[in-house]
Amino acid sequence: MNAPVTAPPVNADNEKLAQRCEKIAESATAAIEWLDVAGEMVRDEGPAMARDFRRETLRARKLAAAARRPMCVSVFGPSQQGKSYLIASLARKGDALTMIRFGEEVRDFVADINPDGGKESTGLVTRFTIRPVIGLPGMPVACRMLSETDIIKIMANAFMEDFDRDTVTALEPKQIEEVMARMRAKAARDPVDRLTEDDVYDLFEYFERYFRNHPSHIALKPAYWREMETLAPRLAIPDRTELFGLLWNLTPTMTRVAVKLITALSQLGFPDEAFCPMAALEPKRSSIIDVETMATLGEDSTDRVPVATRMGQRADLERAVLTAIVAELQLQLADKPFDFFDHTDLLDFPGARTRGKESAQNAEREAAQNIFMLFRRGKVAYLYQRYLAEQELTSMLLCLKHSNQEVATVPFMVNDWIVSTHGATAEARKAHATTLFLVFTMFDVEFAQKAGQQDDSVERWSTRIETTLTQYLGKSPEHTWVHEWVPGQAFNNTYWLRNPAVRDEG
C-alpha cells in the first residue's frame, strides 16, 4: 500500500510564540493572585481588574494552544451547498481516490467512511491532514472531544436559538435563589474534578458575547455568575448541571441529557482527545461521523463503542452519546494532494442550519420529543464558534450555491470570523492578506439553457453575485466588508466552482 506521508517538523517560531503567550497567561494569573491580597490598595476596582486579568489569561492560553496547532483551511457554508465536491477535490491527488490511513490499514474515504446519500449528514468537524495521526493499539480512530463547558454551551445555545426569545419567561429571582441555595448545601469543600473557576468564567464570557440580551442570561445577574465560579467546581456532575440548567430555564430533558453526556466525558477523565476501534465508523449507516447516529440520544441503548485515552481511561459508551461528544474526527491522508498540506490542514465543517422558532412555553414537550434535533442544531452552530474562539480558522472557503439562501445566521458567523482575523474596518483589513474565498458552487446550473429565455450570461451571473453578496452576506448594515473590503474597493475574492463531469443535457 502507500507509504506513510512524512509530516513537516514543528515550527520553532510558533513554539516561541506559544511560550510567550503562556508567560502572559502566567503573569495575568499572578496579577489575579496579587489582587486577592491587595484589597486595601485596589478597593472597589479590584473585582473589575480581576475580571480583566482573567479574560486575558484565557485569551493567552487559547493563543498558545493555537500557535502549536497547524494552520487550517475551513470549508464552511449553509447545509446542502455543494461543499462535499470541493472537499473531495482538495483531499485527493489528481484523479486518485481519497485514501485514509488508520495505523497500518488504508481505507477509501468515499466508499468506507463518508456517509451515503445526498443529505447533510455530519455533526462533527472532519480534519484532513498529512501529519501522523497516532492512535492506540486496536484503536486507530482519533477524535478531539468536547469539554464539559462545551456541552453546557451547546445545550444553552439550543434553548436560546431554537425557542423564540419573545416567548421566554425569564426565571424569577426567587426561583434562581432556590436553586442556588440547594447547591450551596450540596457543595463540597474543594473542587471535585477538573472543572475550574476559569472554566465557569469562560462560560460567562460566551453568553456575554453571543446572548447578552437573552432573557435567560439577563436573569442571571453578575453576582450569581461570580458565585457560580466558586460553587460549580465543588458540585457533583448532576448538581452542577442543574445549576447551569438555569441557562435553559431548568428544562428537565435538556438537563438530563446534558448530565448523560458530561458523565460520559467524566468516565474518560474529561480528555481533549480519545480513540476508538474501526467499529466506531462501521457500518456506515451507524458511524459516529453520521449525525443521524445521534437520533437515539434521549434513549438508553445497548449499542456501545469502546473508547480509550492516552492516560489509560477506558469506557464503553453508547454510540449516540459518543457521536454527540466528539468535536472532530482526525483523518490522515495516505497521499499528499497539494503542497499546502505541508503546513495546513483541511477542515470540513457541518453545514449551518436554519434555527427553530418554537414557543419556549412548550420547551419541555419539544425537548422530550426532539432533543436530537435541538442538540444537533446547537452543536453545529457551536462548533463554528469554538473554532473561531480558539483561533483555528486561518482561511475560509465559503460555499454558496445558486438558490436563495435561508440560513439567516451565516452572514453573522462569517462577519465574526472576518472581524477576528482581518479586522472590523476596511482600514484594518488592508494590512492583511485576504484569506476569505467566496466559492459559488454548482456553477453547472448556470450553463443550462432555460426554455423561453435568452442566453444573457452576463446578466444571469451578475444577478447571482448580487443575490449572494449584496442581498445575503451584505444585507445587515454591520457587514460593511461586502461593500468595502479595503478602502475604496468592494470584496472581490470570488470563484466559480463546477464539476467538469456534469454535462448540460438541455
How does the language model describe each region?
Residues 70-74, 89-113, 129, 162, ...:
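Conserved GTPase G-domain substructure that encodes guanine base recognition and part of the catalytic core
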